[in-house]
Amino acid sequence: MNYSYQENGSKVLLTNGFDTRLNTFHDLQLRWNLSKLFNVRISSVLGRKKNASDYAAGRNYFIDYFETTPVFSYQPSSAFRIALNTKYSQKENNSELAEKATIRDVGIDLRYNQVKKGSFSGRFNFINIDYNASLNSSIAFEMLEGLKTGNNFTWGLTYQRKVAKNLQINLNYNGRKSEDSKTIHSGGMELRAFF
């Protein structure tokens, strides 16, 4: 069992005034090894996000949130792991509109490692979101984590390989699909040098 409390904040002076952000939360994590092959992890977070902008009143929010994330993992060897995960979140903005979001997320993660060569990982998630306010606002973007109400799908692939003694290449691909929206694909490549 692990408990932590964090308070992360920033205040930036822009040409039109200050932009202040604050995120405080309590995080409780439990891990239980059912056997050598199976384990369960549960994380619960209770927190508050605040944003105050001098120049854009539409960017002001004060969100109370709760989320719990159970993960069931199967790892038959050090080279392979598969995990089934869920996440349930509730968020509420303390304003006149009282925006509320409920997010249900179910997914699967795979990881395969080859010693001295590289690793491959993939994930797929189904996310259902209920939201009671307008989608075209910065508050909605923050509360819905960039997704839309209704059913959403997200997925990703990552390949990481050591190409030389001090060089590593990372290839990644991410996709997402929301109801009544086109599929969005993005990818990237990164080359790292270690000195």
Where are these regions (language model features)?
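Exposed, low-structure sequence patches enriched in small/polar residues
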Residues: 1-195
